[in-house]
């Protein structure tokens, strides 16, 4: 595997460099200014070598003279032998075709022979040998091999390399294999992980983030049941990472039903809370009913924080899970926090559209006022969410809540002007001039409010038969009534209004759509049927009893 050939050489070089850096830092003191000393001069050095060494300015001072003549200086006399070993034996800097230069030409390198040479070399400097001792906390190159041919790992293990050596992040090779697991190469990774586990690699060893290999296996998208069961036999199933997540948290988040079942059957704590107060049950319920049933049917009693769990479901817009938990009597959506916030207010706050519609249909009371003076409507404006604003206004909020919402909106220096105008536009048709204009913070919108009232007054003064245009636009919900009046020229002319013209246009569009449905269905029924004998007026009267959805359905069927 070409990647392995490049990786083993690259990290053996880095290993040497990190040992040198460690030795230099130990031998120098901060209050002594040291000078660079010439170590060696090399000729015909490949530019790749120069670029590589330049990445380590704290170790090497490099001067180039002429073409490919390299003078290398260092501050550390005590470790000169180690540095020379690195330059001559590891980099092969004096020979044509150094290891670095040939990394891309993997066919010309006998990696197996190089590994044997490295581990069997009897003439290694003592400093170099220290890097290969078991258990030493260095940047051990074994712990950096991310993808490999497993025979080379076996060679290294058989020569006594410490299998759980860690890098500066506290990661072992087992950590690294799981971190960089690729589904496309899962067979190679699975084999290597099994080799490491069978050779006693510690599944509970934590890196600097508190991740054990077993936690990583649960956290990442690895669905290998065999690896999971091997780790499960030796792992601490309730170990936690830096954020307090356990393996059960992660497999629940990933919706891995079989892994959750195995951990629960092994006695994993289902009530462990992470630093955010979330239990594994909370992580699992957002995915659907199957995991909920598994937790509810377990022998352990679940700790349920009603407000927390409902808000968790709202954040993820998990309507199906909420509905099932309500059906089972596990939760209650009719709560009020100490700030007078309700479940509907939370749905608006987190922009959970589907959850909001569900809660409004189940419990329509959304006219709550929080202790800070916010309402659901003012929160929708603060979130710049026009869709949720339209849903709330369609539920016909009261004049009181609209005035309070407008006051709350205008308290903020930055607010969505268009959404505020939607509120004013809705409120203007419910109130009189004095009630609305007295809101001091609305003075900058006075011209818009006056425009709203002017258009409303015009519509109130215009009658079509026994109804005003205002009644038809704002008070009439029956579509058939609107069909009788909406085609009148006096109604159509109000489509040109600046503020409420769009509302009139929407009504006319709905009328035309319904007329088209009725006409198409009537024609379909005419073919080969006694229906054709009825007068058109009778046909229309009959079909008017169906709503638009029913008319559309019949058209599809016929």
From Swiss-Prot:
SMART domains: ANK (SM00248). Pfam families: Ank_2 (PF12796), PRANC (PF09372). ANK repeats lie at residues 65-95, 169-205, 209-239, 243-272, 276-304, 339-368, 372-401. Keywords: ANK repeat, Repeat. Belongs to the orthopoxvirus OPG189 protein family. Contributes to viral release without involving rearrangement of host actin. This is Ankyrin repeat protein OPG189.
């Amino acid at each position: 595997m070409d990647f392995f050939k490049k990786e083993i050489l690259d990290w053996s070089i880095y290993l040497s460099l990190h040992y040198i850096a460690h030795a230099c830092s130990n031998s120098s003191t901060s209050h002594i200014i040291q000078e660079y000393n010439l170590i060696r001069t090399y000729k015909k050095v490949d530019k790749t070598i120069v670029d590589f060494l330049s990445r380590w300015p704290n170790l090497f001072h490099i001067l180039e003279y002429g073409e490919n003549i390299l003078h290398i200086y260092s501050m550390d006399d005590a470790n000169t032998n180690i540095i020379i070993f690195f330059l001559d034996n590891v980099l092969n800097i004096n020979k044509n075709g150094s290891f670095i230069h040939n990394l891309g030409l993997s066919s010309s390198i006998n990696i197996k022979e190089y590994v044997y040479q490295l581990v069997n070399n009897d003439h290694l400097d003592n400093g170099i040998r220290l890097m290969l001792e078991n258990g030493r906390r260095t940047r051990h190159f074994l712990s950096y091999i991310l993808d490999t041919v497993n025979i080379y790992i076996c060679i290294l293990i058989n020569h006594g390399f410490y299998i759980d050596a860690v890098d500066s992040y506290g990661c072992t090779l087992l950590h690294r294999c799981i971190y960089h697991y690729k589904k496309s190469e899962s067979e190679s990774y699975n084999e290597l992980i099994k080799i490491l586990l069978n050779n006693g690699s510690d599944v509970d060893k934590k890196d600097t983030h508190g991740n054990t290999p077993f936690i990583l296996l649960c956290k990442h998208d690895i669905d290998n049941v065999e690896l999971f069961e091997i780790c499960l036999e030796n792992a601490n199933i309730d170990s936690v990472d830096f954020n307090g997540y356990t393996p059960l948290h992660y497999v629940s988040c990933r919706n891995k039903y079989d892994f959750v079942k195995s951990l629960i059957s092994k006695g994993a704590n289902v009530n462990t809370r992470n630093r955010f107060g979330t239990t594994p049950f909370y992580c699992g319920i957002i995915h659907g009913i199957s995991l909920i049933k598994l937790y509810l049917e377990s022998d352990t009693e679940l700790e349920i924080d009603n407000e927390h769990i409902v808000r968790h479901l709202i954040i993820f817009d998990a309507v199906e899970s909420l509905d099932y938990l309500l059906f089972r009597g596990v939760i209650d959506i009719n709560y009020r926090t100490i700030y007078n916030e309700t479940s509907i207010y939370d749905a608006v706050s987190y922009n959970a559209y589907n959850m909001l519609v569900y809660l409004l249909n189940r419990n329509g009371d959304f006219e709550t006022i929080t202790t800070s003076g916010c309402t659901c409507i003012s929160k929708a404006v603060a979130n710049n969410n026009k869709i949720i604003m339209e849903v709330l206004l369609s539920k016909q909020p009261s004049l009181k809540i609209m005035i309070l919402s407008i006051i709350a909106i205008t308290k903020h220096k930055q607010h969505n002007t268009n959404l505020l105008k939607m509120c004013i536009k809705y409120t203007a048709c419910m109130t009189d001039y004095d009630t609305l204009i007295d809101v001091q913070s609305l003075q900058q919108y006075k011209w818009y409010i006056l425009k709203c009232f002017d258009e409303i007054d015009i519509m109130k003064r215009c009658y079509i038969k026994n109804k005003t245009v205002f009644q038809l636009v704002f008070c009439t919900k029956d579509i058939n009534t609107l069909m009788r009046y909406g085609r009148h020229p006096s109604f159509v002319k109000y489509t040109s209004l600046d503020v409420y013209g769009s509302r009139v246009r929407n009504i006319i569009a709905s009328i035309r759509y319904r007329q088209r449905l009725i006409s198409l269905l009537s024609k379909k029924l005419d073919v080969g049927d006694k229906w054709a004998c009825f007068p058109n007026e009778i046909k229309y009267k009959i079909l008017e009893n169906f709503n638009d959805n029913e008319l559309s359905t019949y058209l599809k069927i016929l």
